Amino acid sequence: MARSDYLFTSESVSEGHPDKVCDRISDTVVDAYLAEMPEARLGVETLATTNRIVIAGEVRGPDSVTFQRLEELTRAAIRDIGYEQDGFHWKHADVAIYLHAQSADIAQGVDASGNKDEGAGDQGIMFGYATDETPALMPAPIYYAHKILKDLADARKARIGDAAKLGPDAKSQVTVRYEGGRPVEATQIVLSTQHLDPSLDSAGVRAIVEPYIRAALPKSWVNDRTVWHVNPTGKFVIGGPDGDCGLTGRKIIVDTYGGAAPHGGGAFSGKDPTKVDRSAAYAARYLAKNVVAAGLSRRATIQLAYAIGVSRPLSIYVDLHGTGEVDEGRLEKVLGEILDLSPRGIRTHLGLNKPIYARTSAYGHFGREPDADGGFSWEKTDLVAKLKSALA
């Protein structure tokens, strides 16, 4: 029997976290190629350390995207994040780029030819999840962990009051108490943030960040019982890639559901949408969110599975966690009918062959508002009517 009273914790990291810097750069490269050639293929990895960035991977795209242009875009991304420190500076860091052509063996399995539809770029399993415990249909712990850091980053960049003393690198963690299966309060709040003023101690940093944290959380969630851990080590001046080496694809739980749902293991950033690690995970979230938005369940987990070179998913699995109003087996069949879940079908329906990925690289790929230019299209709830009709 499912528990209804418990504690659950999720963490987030800011755009200035070393791994997120790398995700941002990798997705900036993806966007640069897709802007020039929507059918470009990319698998791009980034490493960042003290004043050094290494970009490597496989690309099939136009020669108009030069390494010089990619270096300029990389520096612009680092500048936007806010790094102007001796150990990591957008202007002075060394940028090395090692991109080469995509393997012909991989391409032949993915490319459409004759009567063969475009195949998946790799094998794998992908999960999507939705829950009605927040307006964004996301789990509360990860949703609010993201919101805390996004609000602090916005204040830092706008140089609002003492928030200007904060640095780009930060982490948050929120423990939420559930009662009757619903989130009711934050029992523990952890916030570690880089600060540019070396004289600041934990109390000084808390004085800056606490108002933003309280504003980010539901009003009744922070009370006299809430335990705070703000910069527990006391000092956090050296941060970002100068403090810890960063790599693309190391924050896959932060990117998704904060541990509240399964993860297939594949990272998103640096990959074009023929890679089902990315596109099918977006499709699974899209389906799960529409199921919950349609009132068919309070929670939904959806798994998709693919094989390299094969266009159709090998399996579709639905778990409504005992909250469903419909038969899960029937819903599995309907989901495969109302949305073409081939790589091409997903890309076409969600409009994924666009330069919309750099913005996904921090504060979560899910639970965001759809953008007018097609960004976060997988967060739309435009399948609700189709779902209800198909299940009527």
Curated annotation (Swiss-Prot):
Single Gene Ontology MF annotation: ATP binding
PROSITE patterns: ADOMET_SYNTHASE_1, ADOMET_SYNTHASE_2
Co-factor note (free text): Binds 2 divalent ions per subunit. Binds 1 potassium ion per subunit.
The keyword Ion transport appears for this protein: no
Chain residue ranges for the region called Flexible loop: 102-112
Keyword Magnesium: yes
Gene Ontology terms: biological process: one-carbon metabolic process; S-adenosylmethionine biosynthetic process
GO CC field: cytoplasm
Highest taxon, organism lineage: Bacteria
SUPFAM superfamilies (UniProt xref): S-adenosylmethionine synthetase
Necessary cofactors: Mg(2+); K(+)
Subcellular location: Cytoplasm
Pathway involvement of the protein, from the record: Amino-acid biosynthesis; S-adenosyl-L-methionine biosynthesis; S-adenosyl-L-methionine from L-methionine: step 1/1
Biological role: Catalyzes the formation of S-adenosylmethionine (AdoMet) from methionine and ATP. The overall synthetic reaction is composed of two sequential steps, AdoMet formation and the subsequent tripolyphosphate hydrolysis which occurs prior to release of AdoMet from the enzyme.
Subunit structure: Homotetramer; dimer of dimers.
Protein family according to the UniProt entry: Belongs to the AdoMet synthase family.
Designated name of the protein: S-adenosylmethionine synthase
Source organism (scientific name): Methylobacterium nodulans (strain LMG 21967 / CNCM I-2342 / ORS 2060)
Gene giving rise to this polypeptide: metK
